[in-house]
Swiss-Prot record:
Keywords for this protein: Cytoplasm, Lyase, Pyruvate, Ubiquinone biosynthesis
Enzyme Commission number(s): 4.1.3.40
Gene Ontology CC entries for this record: cytosol
UniProt GO BP: pyruvate biosynthetic process; ubiquinone biosynthetic process
Family: Belongs to the UbiC family.
Pathway: Cofactor biosynthesis; ubiquinone biosynthesis
Protein name (record): Probable chorismate pyruvate-lyase
Length: 197
């Protein structure tokens, strides 16, 4: 894999291995390769709701991993992945604006189709190692995940993972924040659909 996510002081919360204190399910889902959408599909019927698509600046901990300037314009896509109608993951994808009109232009036309359709069907796409972190209030991802709960009380912390995809040398970063309903499902039903465990 050619692209490595780099770390500096602002990115200290992102780790190559999950933090101590993560449950076994959390460690598993934070480090699973392949398509998260495909993994969720084993639990039930997956739907994608787009909550935002816009040109915006990157979050404070994103530019270094994308080799970009702190205020460089980016194309941002935010979605909620639900299983059987219940939100399980809040996802934030970001690519340099030029890349969203070039190598990653198809991400602008996905609508409610999962980004995984682009990332795992093209042999020219490479993926970095996954990194993960605990997300608490103050990080923009916490606000995104809390909003996805649709009024339910947010936990003190979420866990999230992140990786960079490259296509023809242009980056696209995907950050996926797991929501409490995912962990409740795994506790009750294991790694399969409701009623299977």
């Amino acid at each position: 894999m050619s692209k490595r996510i780099r770390f500096d002081g602002a990115q200290a919360g992102w780790r190559a291995t999950p933090r101590p204190g993560c449950t076994l399910d959390q460690r598993d889902w934070l480090t699973r390769g392949g398509s998260l959408t495909a993994h969720l599909a084993r639990l039930g019927s997956v739907s994608v709701r787009v909550t935002r698509e816009a040109v915006d600046c990157p979050w404070f901990d994103e530019p270094d991993a994308l080799d970009s300037a702190p205020r460089a314009p980016m194309w941002v896509r935010e979605v909620i992945l639900s299983v059987d109608g219940t939100p399980y993951v809040a996802a934030h994808s970001i690519a340099p604006l030029a890349a969203s009109k070039g190598g990653w232009q198809a991400m602008r036309r996905l609508r409610t189709r999962p980004l995984a359709e682009l990332l795992y069907s093209d042999p020219q796409v490479e993926r970095s190692a996954l990194v993960s972190r605990r997300v608490i209030a103050g990080h923009p991802l916490y606000a995104l995940a809390s909003h996805a709960l649709q009024g339910a009380r947010a936990p003190h912390a979420f866990v999230a993972r992140r990786s960079v995809f490259q296509r023809h040398g242009t980056p696209l970063m995907v950050t996926e924040c797991m929501l409490p309903a995912l962990w409740r499902h795994l506790d009750a039903h294991g790694d399969g659909p409701r009623g299977a465990a």
